[in-house]
Amino acid sequence: MTNLPLWEVFFRGTVAITTQILSNNVVLIMEPVATVKTAAVGFWFPVGSRHEGADQRGVTHFVEHLLFKGTATRSAFDIALAFDRIGGYLNAFTDRESLCLHCVVPANHLAKALEVMVDMVSNSLLEHKEIERERAVIQSEIVSSQDDPEETALDAASEAVWPGHPLAAPIAGSVEEVGRLSRQVLMDWYQSHIVRGPLVICAAGNVDGDFLLKVAENLPQRGVCAKNWLGVARSNGWQGTGPVWNSGLQFKDAPFRQMQFFLQLPACPPVSARDYYCWAVANAVVGDTMSSRLFQKLREEGGYSYNVYSFMTHYSDTTCWCAYASAARKDSRKVVATLYRELNLLKEEGFTPDELEAACQHVCGEEIIAAEDIDYRAKRLFRHHSLGFPQATTEEIVDLIHSLTTEDVAAALNKLLDFDKASLLVYGNRPTESFQKKILALV
């Protein structure tokens, strides 16, 4: 008997992913999975907080909320009830470069779900009373987020490396900025970017491709979708500038008991799926797993931190890698010293074959487990599209990860670990001058 690799056993026979650009400029991407009884669909619009002007801060997030507040033929309750009655899930989110309306439903109810979603992105009323009610809700959401140490710190970390740039602005805006948004501004944004703007529809699961195609073809004419998300924005009139990286040591006072540390480094955006997954494997070696260098040194051996991890954030024209840790004030010097020491060791001595094997298996395992989630598959379709990558099945991705060599990952790490470009943000309660000098001596 031939022993097949695990990923071949799981994914042999996957139906091909299809991408179609329709006459109305809608992009339709589908990954049929006949073995499931659910369907996931996302409507993706290439507009986010990054694309807002100074007098429009928070408008995309505000419009996202208003999609649920009623159309010409459905009340907000009707929209909610339509999904509750079928046991489905409908939600939306705004990011810095996109807005997404997405659902997961039993496959036999997909037609009803799409009918409601199309209505929401075509005929929302944005009534004055709903705007004022939701304005208060969003302002409450913003105030609540300011009580979350990690959320406020993440915004501060973005501001540290891209000061004054829209990529660093809070996605929801401030309480004052949301308070200034008029119905006319909201309606203009909705009409320009949601009703008539570029649209990518990503669907995965037990989907009827012919039916989805008919739904997409019946949508009104849209803006042109280019090969990647930056190109889409540019081709539809956005004239924003790219972010300029700001390195160095910064301290920010915050009313929280623990100190938080963000060591950030810039990277070029991945130009291929191979680049993307190479970064993922490198990140797993450094800090993304419990067996990673930083987790072992800062938590398991040092006992300094409960929260230790690293992550990469990809935008259309830049990438940021970040190592994060939180600790008691008394352990601050040890945390910073350990961060720099371990990263320098990785740069000078590299990693072991066992570390690389473990990291590759970890990233493969994540993909295999995540692929059980149809919503994840639909979002992965969009990720590949927005970054300009060819679509790939789980099997193809796992094969790609296993093809990465020690040289591939080492080159990625060496390129990343340029400490002349490092930005360290120390975020916490009353960083005194004496405290700052002690940290400065370590970097």
Feature map (PLM): residue ranges:
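Short hydrophobic-aromatic micro-motifs
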Residues: V27-M30, K252, F261-L263
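Charge-rich, well-structured scaffold segments of protease-associated domains
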Residues: N3-P5, I21, P32, A76-G231, ...
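Short solvent-exposed loop/turn micro-motifs enriched in small/polar/acidic residues
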Residues: F11-T14, R234-S235, P243-W245
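Active-site-flanking beta-strand signature of metal-NTP-handling nucleotidyl enzymes
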Residues: A40-F43, Q260-Q264, S423-L425
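Acidic, glycine-rich loop-and-beta core segments that form the ion-binding/anion-interacting portion
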Residues: V244, F256-Q258, L263-L265, S272
